[in-house]
Regions:
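Conserved P-loop NTPase-based nucleic-acid remodeling module centered on helicase motor cores
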Residues: 1-49, 55, 70, 236
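Short alpha-helix plus adjacent loop in nuclease-associated cores
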Residues: 1-2, 165-170, 199-200, 290-313
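Alpha-helical scaffold elements adjacent to nucleotide-binding pockets in ATP/GTP-utilizing enzyme cores
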Residues: 2, 20, 24-28, 141-144, ...
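Conserved helicase NTPase motor core
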Residues: 16-21, 51, 71-181, 194-200
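Amphipathic alpha-helical transducer elements in NTP-driven molecular machines
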Residues: 18-22, 44, 76, 80, ...
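Proline-centered turn/helix-capping motifs that create local helix->coil transitions or kinks
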Residues: 55-63, 149-151, 211-221
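Conserved helicase C-terminal RecA-like lobe
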Residues: 68, 72, 155-158, 260, ...
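Helicase P-loop NTPase motor core
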Residues: 187-190, 195-287, 310-314
């Protein structure tokens, strides 16, 4: 907040969360009367994803649709108008979304040498974790914070931790070239290979090493572990989510003949992926506990309280106002 964007002038501003962003895009969509009576028009959450993806990949929205949602190309023009309306909405209401924070910081570091110098003096060492999942603007911010060679941070004061073989967020705009090109951007960078794996057994690492050998471009490494034994890796390709769930249930039933329930776990990439398995377990009469889900700040009652505080800070925060209004009868 110390280095607020110039276009805000002296107005208060609010940083939006995901629910606010959805509400703002929906308000703009309703204002433009888009999708009325058209069941094929993309839903608000999907639109938010495409708008953010276009910014993070630094592409035009129609280019993103061409590559990733060809069936939505007929809606490219109205969706681009909606994107422009959303941009105007945020500026009018004094709102910044997550993507704004990145691009406004980059703009500050490029155009305000005094602010850039202050930040470099304040943050004398930079450590970026999961560097393989950074996008283009995040990598540029790291470079700008480091400063020009000979004038910015001393060599060795920038450290990136990551694994180019684990770049899984390209769909959000992550660019694996950021970590592959790190030694070129920071000449003299020292590469420290962390090859001992403390989590996995040898059969798992044998498969991983075999896959790594086929990479066309990477930092060569040979993973090893002191954990001997372990079951061999099995690759199973179910025909559907439900057949996968039934397969897992049968495996759990078999394991329960030899193990206690608390010794059995199923790992998921995301909480909602467990939906079919939860149904299958209930049908089989197998009790289970699910760990994970909504974060505390995303719970409805917490967001209600936060809406009051945000509205006091910024009376133009319409997503917060709408949430508060819904809590009181006779408003709206």
């Amino acid at each position: 907040r110390r280095y607020r964007p110039d276009w805000l002038e002296d107005r208060p501003f609010t940083v939006m969360d995901s629910a606010d962003i959805n509400a703002a895009v929906k308000a703009c969509k309703d204002e433009l009367r888009l999708g009325k009576g058209d069941r094929s028009f993309p839903r608000t959450q999907a639109i938010v994803g495409f708008l953010s993806k276009a910014r993070n990949k630094e592409m035009r929205l129609d280019e993103v649709l061409q590559r990733e949602a060809f069936h939505l190309l007929p809606y490219a023009e109205p969706l681009m108008r909606l994107g422009e309306a959303y941009d105007a909405y945020r500026k009018e209401k004094g709102l910044l979304d997550y993507d704004d924070l990145l691009f406004e910081l980059e703009h500050l570091l490029r155009t305000n040498e005094r602010a850039a110098g202050n930040l470099r003096r304040r943050y004398t060492h930079i450590l970026v974790d999961e560097y393989q999942d950074t996008n283009l603007v995040q990598a540029r911010i790291v470079r700008l914070l480091a400063g020009p060679e000979g004038e910015g941070l001393p060599p060795g004061n920038v450290m990136a931790v990551g694994d180019e073989a684990q770049s899984i967020y390209a769909f959000r705009g992550a660019n694996v070239r950021n970590i592959l090109d790190f030694p070129k951007l920071f000449p003299g960078a020292r590469i420290i290979r962390l090859e001992e794996n403390y989590r996995s057994t040898r059969p798992i690492l044998d498969v991983a090493n075999n896959l790594l050998e086929h990479a066309t471009e990477s930092f060569r490494k040979k993973l090893f572990t002191r954990r001997e034994g372990g079951a061999p890796v099995r690759l199973v390709t179910p025909l559907s989510d439900m057949s996968q769930a039934r397969l897992v249930v049968r495996r759990i039933e078999d394991l329960l003949t030899r193990h206690l329930p608390h010794e059995i776990a199923v790992l998921f990439r995301a909480g909602f992926h467990s939906y079919h398995l939860e149904m299958a377990l209930n049908q089989a009469g197998i009790a289970f506990r699910k760990y994970g889900g909504l974060r505390y700040t995303e719970a409805a009652h917490v967001k209600d309280v936060m809406a009051y505080a945000r509205l006091l800070l910024n009376p133009l925060d319409m997503p917060a106002f709408s949430r508060v209004a819904e809590l009181h009868e006779g408003i709206g």
